[in-house]
Amino acid sequence: MEHRGVTVWFTGLSGAGKTTISHALAERLKAAGCKLEILDGDIVRTNLTKGLGFSKEDRDENIRRIGFVSHLLTRNGVIVFVSAISPYREIREEVRQRIGDFVEIFVNAPLEECERRDVKGLYQRARAGEIKGFTGIDDPYEAPTNPEVECRTDLEELEESIEKVMKKLTELGYITP
């Protein structure tokens, strides 16, 4: 499969399915011969952005750093999947402008569904006041106003979400089957 560099940014609440979709799709594209890297928010926080907290300023800096690395990879012909909550619209737009070749995927599931899926108990801890500034509970998540793709993970199967993203990447000329 031929491809060109692009950053595919999966955004949504914790537990919406960002990592599930991005990893399943990455496996398929890598098997087809695509150069692809995944920048997962949880992994990035323990390496690239270690030491940053969860204030708005720190979250924005986290996204800027992910965006910087994504831009370097994208301009060198790599498909980059970013799987990060990235709750603020303005910083996502800033990163989109910097990178250029950028496709936003809104991984959308209702808060109740995300809480039901929460294997780490983060939502429960946030509701109990043990975690402050948790996105979706006491810190806002600003949904994209015009994402290239919206995956409703409460209503569609994983394969349907993967196909929607593949179709869009093909339409935009980033991958050629």
UniProtKB/Swiss-Prot annotation:
One of its GO terms (biological process) is sulfate assimilation via adenylyl sulfate reduction. Its EC number is 2.7.1.25. It catalyses: adenosine 5'-phosphosulfate + ATP = 3'-phosphoadenylyl sulfate + ADP + H(+). GO terms for cellular component: cytoplasm. The keyword Phosphoprotein applies. ATP binds at residues 12-19. Signal peptide: none annotated. The active site is at 86 (phosphoserine intermediate). GO terms for molecular function: adenylylsulfate kinase activity; ATP binding; sulfate adenylyltransferase (ATP) activity. Pathway: Sulfur metabolism; hydrogen sulfide biosynthesis; sulfite from sulfate: step 2/3. The keyword Repeat does not apply. Keywords: ATP-binding, Kinase, Nucleotide-binding, Phosphoprotein, Transferase. InterPro entries: APS_kinase, P-loop_NTPase, Sulf_AdTrans/APS_kinase. It holds the Pfam family APS_kinase. Belongs to the APS kinase family. Catalyzes the synthesis of activated sulfate. This is Adenylyl-sulfate kinase. It comes from Picosynechococcus sp. (strain ATCC 27264 / PCC 7002 / PR-6). The gene is cysC.
